[in-house]
Curated annotation (Swiss-Prot):
Disulfide bonds: C107-C113, C183-C190, C323-C359, C364-C414
Similarity section: Belongs to the glycosyl hydrolase 5 (cellulase A) family.
Top-level EC class as recorded in UniProt: hydrolase
Entry remark concerning the domains of this protein: The enzyme consists of two functional domains, a catalytic core joined to a carbohydrate-binding domain (CBM) by a serine-, threonine-, and proline-rich, highly glycosylated linker sequence.
Residues at the catalytic site: E239, E350
Protein name, as recorded: Endoglucanase EG-II
Any GO BP: cellulose catabolic process
SMART domains xref list: fCBD (SM00236)
Catalytic reaction equation(s): Endohydrolysis of (1->4)-beta-D-glucosidic linkages in cellulose, lichenin and cereal beta-D-glucans
Signal peptide coordinates: 1-21
């Protein structure tokens, strides 16, 4: 999860025209308990995302209503509209899903991954059927929530049994592959995510720590294993931080080349930037400029997708239950402009909040914006389900009972697509 501590607070100004107040584009214009302006600025209309939150959507012409309060476990009808300032995107983002965590447990932000702390989301991991049922969760998310993608975090050390630069460990990769195959069997896209923060046991890859050759060896083996699987998505690294971005981009280039040369010639590859992959810092910290130079061996950038994260709490750390921002003005709007100008796309592979009203409000608004700008945003992946239990502050793990599952309020209100 994102550990950046650069808060981005939503600017919520109110414009006054004559005697009647008008709300700005993307501002709140209604909902239970709302006492502010209900008239929207010219060119936008008030659309209801849930009973507690309505928003001024550019280009919208109708007001829609939710079928239920957002705290319930059933499905919400959410508004979609097309912005007059961007290409038509009424169908929304292509990919929506959740992180299925567990193989990454034990990994810390210095790239140390204690393999004994791995808690795989595989129900029958030890033959006793008492582990979290990550495959069952994914089946529910696909069948009941219309999800199409899952990110499967795993520690580098786990995959090679702590042998830096070594071969994939046959036992470890067979266990992890059970989760990948379970994902693929559902028709979903499956992101193989190395959850090491651009490090191995404190050393930065290609910057005094592991060599680029040691890192590309890992990815060459993974790409070779999944070369025939068109729906396996290669997530190069989770949340690089405090790296030299130009040197890191050179490392990323070597990985992309290695993946393509291993036979995975057309699958999606995620390109992660500095500063914990912050969507708000992606342009300003030089990640956008540096990673724009990364290409496929043929010189194209086909299916090379920028990989960003963004949480909604006060310090963007993803550690608080309450949310304070929808990230539109501070992150996703300026990034959308840059992506359009440069003919590129991004995917949000971590985002989350508590199962409380402030997060339902802000997350639904954030997701709505991504759907409105699906020409540049391919999708979103919430954090997190899998081996997280109900006590985790950002849990998105559904509760299973027999053959049925009940979603958390944030998932049912905002992340689900049905």
């Amino acid at each position: 999860m994102n550990k950046s501590v650069a808060p981005l607070l939503l600017a919520a100004s109110i414009l006054y025209g004559g005697a009647a107040a008008q709300q700005t584009v993307w501002g709140q214009c209604g909902g239970i308990g709302w006492s502010g302006p209900t008239n929207c600025a010219p060119g936008s209309a008030c659309s209801t995302l849930n009973p507690y939150y309505a928003q001024c959507i550019p280009g919208a012409t109708t007001i829609t209503t939710s079928t239920r309060p957002p705290s319930g476990p059933t499905t919400t009808t959410r508004a979609t509209s097309t912005s007059s300032s961007t290409p038509p995107t009424s169908s929304g983002v292509r990919f929506a899903g959740v992180n299925i965590a567990g193989f990454d447990f034990g990994c810390t932000t210095d790239g140390t991954c204690v393999t004994s702390k791995v808690y795989p989301p595989l129900k029958n991991f030890t033959g006793s059927n008492n582990y979290p049922d990550g495959i069952g969760q994914m089946q529910h998310f696909v069948n009941d929530d219309g999800m199409t993608i899952f990110r499967l975090p795993v520690g580098w050390q786990y995959l090679v049994n702590n042998n830096l630069g070594g071969n994939l460990d046959s036992t470890s990769i067979s266990k992890y592959d059970q989760l990948v195959q379970g994902c693929l069997s559902l028709g979903a896209y499956c992101i193989v995510d190395i959850h090491n923060y651009a490090r191995w046991n404190g050393g930065i890859i290609g910057q005094g720590g592991p060599t680029n050759a040691q890192f590309t060896s890992l990815w060459s083996q993974l790409a070779s294993k999944y070369a025939s699987q068109s729906r396996v998505w290669f997530g190069i690294m989770n949340e690089p931080h405090d790296v030299n971005i130009n040197t890191w981009a050179a490392t990323v280039q070597e990985v992309v080349t290695a993946i393509r040369n291993a036979g995975a010639t057309s699958q999606f590859i995620s390109l992660p930037g500095n500063d914990w992959q912050s969507a708000g810092a992606f342009i300003s910290d030089g990640s956008a400029a540096a990673l724009s130079q990364v290409t496929n061996p043929d010189g194209s950038t086909t299916n090379l997708i920028f990989d960003v994260h963004k949480y909604l709490d006060s310090d963007n750390s993803g550690t608080h239950a309450e949310c304070t921002t929808n990230n539109i003005d501070g992150a996703f709007s300026p990034l959308a402009t840059w992506l359009r100008q440069n003919n590129r796309q991004a995917i949000l592979t971590e985002t989350g909040g508590g199962n409380v009203q402030s997060c339902i409000q802000d997350m639904c608004q954030q997701i709505q914006y991504l759907n409105q700008n699906s020409d540049v945003y391919l999708g979103y992946v919430g954090w997190g389900a899998g081996s997280f239990d109900s006590t985790y502050v950002l849990t998105e793990t559904p509760t299973g009972s027999g053959n049925s599952w009940t979603d958390t309020s944030l998932v049912s209100s905002c992340l689900a697509r049905k």
